[in-house]
Regions:
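C-terminal motif of bacterial Sec signal peptides marking the signal peptidase cleavage site
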Residues: 6-9
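OB-fold nucleic-acid-binding modules
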Residues: 11-80, 84-286
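Extended extracellular/luminal ectodomain segments enriched in beta-structured repeat modules
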Residues: 63-64, 343-347, 354-363, 373
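Solvent-exposed strand-to-loop "edge" motifs in beta-rich extracellular domains
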Residues: 71, 119-121, 299-303, 353-357, ...
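Exposed beta-strand and adjacent loop surfaces of beta-rich binding modules
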Residues: 80-82, 216, 361, 373-377
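Predominantly extracellular/luminal cell-surface or secreted proteins
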Residues: 86-88, 379-384
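Beta-strand-rich interaction surfaces with strong enrichment in secreted/lumenal proteins
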Residues: 103-105, 235-239, 337-339, 349-354
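Extracellular glycan-recognition surfaces and repeat-rich motifs
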Residues: 297-336
Length: 384
C-alpha cells in the first residue's frame, strides 16, 4: 500500500492522518455548486461543460472552478472510484466519478478542501438510480458520466492546503430529517440516538445481500428506519454489527427513492449505550382470560391501518420487528406476518389463551405466500 511508509514501524493501533507537503494552488472558485444543480440535466442526458475561454490580452486560458470539502473515503473499501464532496457552505454535495485508488492516502482525506476544474467535464443530475449532481468524463456506451482516467484526474481534481475537522462540516440531523433529506443529499451527516434494527444487530454488515455487490441493513429510532448500504468489498463487511445504541456518521446518498447512509469506515459507528426494545410484546387487556371456546375470524379488527393490538391475545415480535397484523384480501380479513423488506430474520408469536379442559379441538386455515420453507409452528403452553 502507498500509505505504508507514512506510519511508524512499531506496533501501534492508533493511526495518524497522513502528512503531506503542500503547495497552495492559488485558485479561486468561479462557480457555485448550487448553480450547477440548476443547470444540470435531470432527464438522463449529460452536458459537457464548455472549454476554457482565453484572455484577450494575455492569451491565457481562463478556467472555471468549484470548491468543496472531501467527505468520502475509500479507506474502508466502501467507496470505489467514486468520491463525494460537500460545498463549503454545507449545501447539497456532489459525486465525482474518477479512476483513483487509495484516495485517502493521496491528499484527499475527509475535510480536505479541493478545487474541481469544470471545463470539458461531463455532468448531470439524474433523478433515477444514483441521485444528485455527478461529474466525470464524457459519456461512453457503459456510463452516461464515465470515470476520469487515472492520468487525467490531477488536471481536474486539485487539493488545496486547507483541511478542517469533520466535526466542523458534518450535519447533525435526526433520522426523520435524513429520510426527507433533499437538503442534505450527498453531504456528511451524523444521526444520534439510533440503533441497528433487531434483524441487523449482532449480524454482519453484509448479512442482507440485495445484489451481488451490496447489502442493506437498517438503523431505527423506534419510529422510522433508514438504510445503511455496505459494499461486499468493504473491509468491515463481515464484521459484527453493534448491538448497542448511539450514533452513526456517513455520506447521505439516494438511490431511486431510498435515502441511505454509506459509511466510510467502521469508525463511523459509535453505539456504546444500552439497547432499547422498540418492539415489546403487545399485551391485550383481556389476554389473561382463558375462555372455553375461541372462534376468531378477525373481521372485527381494522385493516386500514392494520391492527396489531388484539384485546384477547398477546402479539409478540420476539425476534426482529415484525408483528402479526390484520390484512384484507377479497373482502376476507386475516392476520399476516412477513419478513419482507425487514433486513433480516423475524419470529413473531400470537398467544391465544384458551381453557383446554373444556376445549379439545384446534383448527385454523393458513395460506403461504412466496413459500420458502416451513415457517409456521403451533405450540401448546400450559399455564396454571
Amino acid at each position: 500500500m502507498a500509505a505504508i511508509g507514512l506510519f511508524s514501524s512499531c506496533v501501534n493501533d492508533t493511526y495518524d492522518t497522513p502528512k503531506f507537503d503542500c503547495v497552495n494552488p492559488g485558485l479561486t472558485k468561479t462557480k457555485e455548486v448550487a448553480a450547477l444543480y440548476t443547470s444540470a440535466p435531470t432527464n438522463g442526458t449529460t452536458v459537457i461543460y464548455p472549454a476554457p475561454t482565453k484572455d484577450p490580452v494575455t492569451g491565457k486560458e481562463i478556467f472555471d472552478y468549484i470548491e468543496a470539502y472531501v467527505i468520502s473515503s475509500d479507506e474502508g473499501g466502501n467507496f470505489y472510484k467514486s468520491m463525494y464532496f460537500q460545498p463549503t457552505d454545507g449545501s447539497k454535495g456532489f459525486n465525482l466519478s474518477v479512476d483513483i485508488s487509495n484516495a485517502y492516502a493521496q491528499n484527499f482525506q475527509p475535510g480536505k478542501k479541493v478545487f474541481l476544474k469544470l471545463n470539458n467535464l461531463a455532468y448531470a443530475n439524474p433523478t433515477s438510480f444514483g441521485r444528485g449532481l455527478i461529474f466525470g468524463a464524457p459519456p461512453t456506451e457503459q456510463y452516461a458520466v464515465d470515470r476520469i482516467p487515472t492520468l487525467e484526474y490531477p488536471k481536474y481534481l486539485i487539493p488545496s492546503c486547507d483541511i478542517v475537522s469533520e466535526d466542523a462540516i458534518v450535519h447533525k440531523i435526526t433520522l426523520a430529517q435524513a429520510l426527507s433529506g433533499a437538503n442534505y443529499l450527498n453531504t456528511l451527516v451524523e444521526i444520534d440516538d439510533v440503533q441497528f434494527t433487531d434483524e441487523a444487530a449482532g449480524g454482519t454488515y453484509d448479512s442482507n445481500r440485495t445484489d451481488e455487490y451490496d447489502s442493506s441493513i437498517f438503523i431505527t429510532d423506534g419510529a422510522k428506519t433508514l438504510t445503511i448500504r455496505t459494499s461486499r468489498f468493504a473491509n468491515f463487511a463481515g464484521h459484527k454489527v453493534p448491538t448497542g445504541k448511539g450514533k452513526i456518521r456517513g455520506v447521505l446518498t439516494r438511490y431511486n427513492s431510498t435515502y441511505q447512509i454509506i459509511m466510510r469506515t467502521e469508525r463511523d459507528v459509535n453505539m456504546p449505550n444500552p439497547r432499547v426494545d422498540y418492539t415489546p410484546a403487545i399485551i391485550g387487556t383481556n389476554s389473561t382470560v382463558f375462555p372455553g371456546t375461541v372462534n376468531e375470524t378477525f373481521e372485527s379488527y381494522s385493516s386500514l391501518p392494520s391492527q396489531t393490538n388484539f384485546p384477547n391475545y398477546i402479539n409478540d415480535a420476539a425476534v426482529g420487528s415484525k408483528y402479526w397484523w390484520v390484512k384484507t384480501f377479497s373482502s376476507n380479513k386475516y392476520i399476516e406476518m412477513t419478513s419482507h423488506n425487514s433486513g433480516g430474520a423475524n419470529n413473531a408469536y400470537l398467544f391465544v389463551p384458551v381453557n383446554m379442559t373444556t376445549a379439545n379441538n384446534l383448527s385454523f386455515k393458513t395460506n403461504m405466500g412466496y413459500w420458502n420453507g416451513a415457517v409456521l409452528n403451533v405450540y401448546y403452553v400450559l399455564a396454571s
